[in-house]
């Protein structure tokens, strides 16, 4: 077999490999989101403790038996699901599955019917005070404010809207120590409400040492 045939077969093999492994990677791509956005878009937001883990209840899926400690938000359908105390996720990391550690407490903000890498899940002890306050009620007070992902200097210099806060996924100060909240502003036409990043003490400290 000559060199061209070898190269042809190699090319076909590489195409097949990328086609096979490329699909799960595409399926797992998700836009970065601020914790406040996760709260707003979630079907349920709970604080839970992971009790057990099983890979045999449902083929291709990992099922976690959990104890729901607090429910911060849930649709009626999500409440019915949570009564069973079970959350499932794809068994394979390449199919967007996640791993929760047994015995640990997490805040989880998820969409029905499954938990995956695009969901919000964070160990409670690793959360900042601002994040804890946001999920326990702070974010619910800012339903009229939207966090908008912003990439590059051109975006941040662009037009600002009264109901949004621009956010860089690399901005740890806004992510960990602030929330997009309504704020009263005095104008020539009277008092209006605009959304802005809440200037907590921890946020100001972070901004002074970015």
From Swiss-Prot:
**Residues reported to bind Zn(2+):** 28
- What is this protein's function per UniProt? Metalloproteinase inhibitor that acts on both matrix metalloproteinases Mmp1 and Mmp2 in vitro. Complexes with metalloproteinases and irreversibly inactivates them by binding to their catalytic zinc cofactor. Required for wing maturation which is the final step in morphogenesis of the adult fly. Involved in the negative regulation of developmental tissue invasion for imaginal disk eversion during metamorphosis by inhibiting Mmp-mediated basement membrane (BM) degradation. Required for oogenesis and for the long-term maintainance of germarial structure and shape in the adult ovaries.
Which family, according to the similarity comment? Belongs to the protease inhibitor I35 (TIMP) family.
Q: Which superkingdom?
A: Eukaryota
What InterPro entries does the annotation carry? Answer: Netrin_domain, TIMP, TIMP-like_OB-fold, TIMP_C
Q: Where is the segment annotated Involved in metalloproteinase-binding? A: 28-31, 93-94
Q: Where is the signal peptide?
A: 1-27
Please state every residue range assigned to the domain named NTR.
28-145
Output the Gene Ontology terms for molecular function.
metalloendopeptidase inhibitor activity; zinc ion binding
Q: Which Gene3D superfamilies match?
A: 2.40.50.120, Tissue inhibitor of metalloproteinase-1. Chain B, domain 1 (3.90.370.10)
Annotated tissue distribution: Expressed in heads of female and male adult flies. Expressed at the time of eclosion in unopened wings of adult flies. Strongly expressed at the tip of ovarian germarium region 1 where germline stem cells (GSCs) and cystoblasts reside and in region 2 of the germarium.
**Record's Pfam families?**
TIMP (PF00965)
Quote the subcellular location field of this record. Secreted
Q: Which UniProt keywords apply?
A: Developmental protein, Differentiation, Disulfide bond, Metal-binding, Metalloenzyme inhibitor, Metalloprotease inhibitor, Oogenesis, Protease inhibitor, Secreted, Signal, Zinc
Q: What happens when the gene is disrupted?
A: Adult flies display wings inflated with lymph, suffer from a bloated gut and progressive dissolution of internal tissues, have reduced fertility, show impaired fast phototactic responses, and die prematurely. Flies display wings with fluid filled blisters approximately 22 hours after eclosion resulting from failure of dorsal and ventral cuticular wing surfaces to bond following normal migration of the epithelial cells from the wing. Female flies are sub-viable, semi-sterile and grow smaller ovaries.
Q: What is this protein called?
A: Tissue inhibitor of metalloproteinase
């Amino acid at each position: 077999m000559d060199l061209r045939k070898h190269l042809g077969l190699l090319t076909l093999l590489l195409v097949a490999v990328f086609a096979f492994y490329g699909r799960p990677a595409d399926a797992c791509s998700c836009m970065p989101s601020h914790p406040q956005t996760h709260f707003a878009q979630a079907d349920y937001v709970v604080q839970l403790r992971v009790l057990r883990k099983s890979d045999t209840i449902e083929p291709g899926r990992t099922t976690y038996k959990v104890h729901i400690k607090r429910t911060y938000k849930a649709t009626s359908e999500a409440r019915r699901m949570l009564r069973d105390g079970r959350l499932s996720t794809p068994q394979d990391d390449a199919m967007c599955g996640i791993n929760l550690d047994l015995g640990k407490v997490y805040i989880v903000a998820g969409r029905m019917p499954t938990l995956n890498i695009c969901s919000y899940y964070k160990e409670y002890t690793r959360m900042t005070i601002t994040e804890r306050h946001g999920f326990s009620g702070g974010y619910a007070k800012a339903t009229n404010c939207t966090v908008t992902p912003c990439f590059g200097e051109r975006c941040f210099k662009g037009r600002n809207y009264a109901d949004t806060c621009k956010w860089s996924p690399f901005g740890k100060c806004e992510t960990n120590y602030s929330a997009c909240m309504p704020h009263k502003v005095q104008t020539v036409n009277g008092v209006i409400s605009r959304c802005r990043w809440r200037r907590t003490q921890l946020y100001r400290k972070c901004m002074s040492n970015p």
